[in-house]
Every structure is written in C-alpha cells, then in structure tokens.
Amino acid sequence: VLCLLKRTEPALRALIASPDFAVDGFLCPGHVAAILGAEAFRFLPEEYGLPAVVSGFTPGDLVYSISLLVEQCAEKRPALSNTYTRVVRDAGNPAAKAMMDAVLTPCTSTWRGLGEIAGGGFAIREAYAAYDAAKKFGFSPAPAADPPGCGCGHVIRGAAAPEGWPRLGKACAPAARGGAGRGCREGAWGGGWGGGGGGGRA
C-alpha cells in the first residue's frame, strides 16, 4: 500500500493561518465527516469564529448547505451545522475510526498550495510496515513541482477564482492539465471549466 492519505484538520488550520486567507465560511466534506463525525469540524466556529456546514453532494444538499452558510455569515452567527444527517452522525463511525487509529499514524505531509504541514497526512504504523510500499520498495514519493504559471495553490486556498486565471481553457484544460487541481472534475477548477467535458467553460 502506498499511503498518501491526508488529514483535514491540520490542513484547514494551515489554510486559516495563511497570509492571504479570505474565506468567510466552510462547506465541510460529508464523506470525511461520515467517518470522523460532524464534531470533527467544531473547531472552526469555536476557535476561529468561522461558520461550518457539513454537506452532502447532491444539488439539493449543496443548495441547502450554502443557504445555511450564507445565513450564518449574514447574521454573524458562526456555528456548526450538519445537513447530511442521513449519512453523518456527530461522533462519526466509531468502528472505522478505531481501524484507522490501529493502522495509521499522523505524519508530516505536503499539500499543494499550503506546503509542508505537520500532522497533515497519515503514515502506516510500524506494526503494519510489511504492507507499506514506500518501505518495502525503498522510496519516498516526492511532491511534483507546479508547472510555471500554475494557479492551483491560489485557487485551493480561495485566494483566486479559476475563472479569472489566464491559463484556464488554454494551457490548463482537461486535455492539457496545468496542475493537480485540474486533474479532476470536482472543486473550483471543475466548476470553472464547466464539468471538464472539453466543451468549454460554464
């Protein structure tokens, strides 16, 4: 197993501490919260005064979650809300968390746009080293360097919108990806392109 798993909380804390941080609130990932629990994001309103809404992924989920987030921002009432209650519990999935704790341990990890984050990833515990591909084959995956002019880090941090990035639709498109952010149809880059089907932007 080549373990490149990431940890959400350290990355969010690093994002908030970045000098160009300009985010008013967070839609928190429902698939992460399904394991860790909605309470894993409680630190956002309590420590940073930032609204946080755990959301699912259907259009209805997203519209409702965004409406709650906007309401919290407008009323200056930061709180943690969970609109994905059909999947996410406050405490998450105890059995899955116990398995993760048994097999994985936090480690320093590199995040695109945020750099190296202490505790930002997971490593396989020594007890399971026989299954760790990096140890078995004696290599350490190095993060790929961003190509010149790559805007992935800026967009991931919320410091720039993909629609205004000069490479979008030119050097950075589904058929000619200019960085990891354009490697999938999800997130801000996918929305900026219009789904990534190659037919142009939304």
Which residues are covered by each model-predicted region?
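Internal helical hairpin/lid segments
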Residues: 64-154
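Short, flexible loop segments at boundaries between secondary-structure elements
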Residues: 4-17
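Solvent-exposed alpha-helices and their adjacent loops that cap or buttress functional pockets
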Residues: 16-25, 43-47, 144, 157-158, ...
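Cysteine-cluster motifs in flexible loop/terminal segments that predominantly coordinate metals
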Residues: 140-195
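Predominant activation on well-ordered alpha-helical scaffold segments within soluble catalytic domains
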Residues: 12-13, 38-45, 60-71, 97-101, ...
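A conserved active-site cap/scaffold subdomain adjacent to cofactor or substrate pockets
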Residues: 2, 20-89
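Compositionally biased, low-complexity flexible segments
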Residues: 196-202
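Fold-independent oxyanion-binding glycine-rich loops
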Residues: 4-7, 29-32, 56-57, 152-155, ...
